[in-house]
């Protein structure tokens, strides 16, 4: 963001939150020019630059016995209630965990609130745990959990000089370098 502001001081960069379910449609419909997306995503008609893999974490009530460990493995989750939401991006299941007696919650925020009440645990990418952090929950890295791959994506037919400039910044080009 800072590099963009330095190079393009007259062009505001607006961050628009997208769900995994709507990320591709937002790009194709032109609602956004470029997006950070979670993979997998249908790549047809899109340009993608893989950026990084996000570490999975177990979100738990702050007083959970699981919080005594620095990191966890799937085996550590046996006997826990594994809470998922409809916008769950990992679809993680662990042997020995149980599903709650209630329907899947609507959002990740709902799942974290339910975890805070001591009902169970949730597994999600670290950025989502940080986004929905509360004083009454904590999280630990899940060593053998699934990563969430993040990429930069834009409509291949709708590249503009501003999109090219942003891609250049992401790729580490200097202000004076060219493609």
Q: Residue spans of the language-model regions?
A:
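N-terminal hydrophobic or amphipathic helices and topogenic motifs
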Residues: 1-14, 31, 168-179
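Short beta-strand-centered segments that line the small-molecule binding cleft or hinge
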Residues: 3, 7, 19-56, 136-140
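Short loop/turn segments at beta->alpha junctions
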Residues: 19, 73, 106-107, 125
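A ligand-binding cleft/hinge motif common to bilobed small-molecule-binding domains
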Residues: 24, 28, 37-44, 92-95, ...
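Short secondary-structure boundary segments
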Residues: 39-40, 62, 86, 125-128, ...
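Flexible hinge/capping segments at coil-to-helix
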Residues: 48-56, 60-82, 164
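Secondary-structure junction motif
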Residues: 67-106, 112-113, 160
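A late-sequence structural motif
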Residues: 140-179
């Amino acid at each position: 963001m800072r590099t963009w502001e330095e190079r393009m001081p007259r062009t505001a960069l607006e961050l628009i939150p997208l769900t995994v379910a709507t990320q591709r449609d937002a790009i194709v419909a032109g609602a956004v020019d470029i997006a950070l997306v979670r993979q997998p995503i249908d790549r047809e008609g899109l340009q993608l630059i893989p950026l990084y893999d996000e570490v999975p974490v177990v979100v738990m009530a702050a007083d959970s016995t699981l919080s005594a460990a620095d990191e966890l493995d799937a085996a550590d989750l046996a006997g826990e209630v594994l809470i998922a939401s409809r916008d769950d991006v990992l679809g993680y299941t662990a042997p020995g965990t149980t599903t709650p007696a209630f329907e899947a919650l609507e959002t990740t925020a709902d799942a974290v609130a339910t975890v805070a009440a001591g009902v169970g645990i949730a597994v999600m990418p670290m950025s989502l745990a940080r986004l929905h952090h509360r004083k009454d929950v904590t999280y630990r890295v899940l060593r053998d959990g699934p990563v969430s791959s993040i990429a930069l994506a834009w409509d291949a037919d709708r590249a503009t000089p501003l999109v090219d400039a942003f891609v250049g910044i992401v790729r580490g080009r200097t202000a004076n370098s060219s493609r």
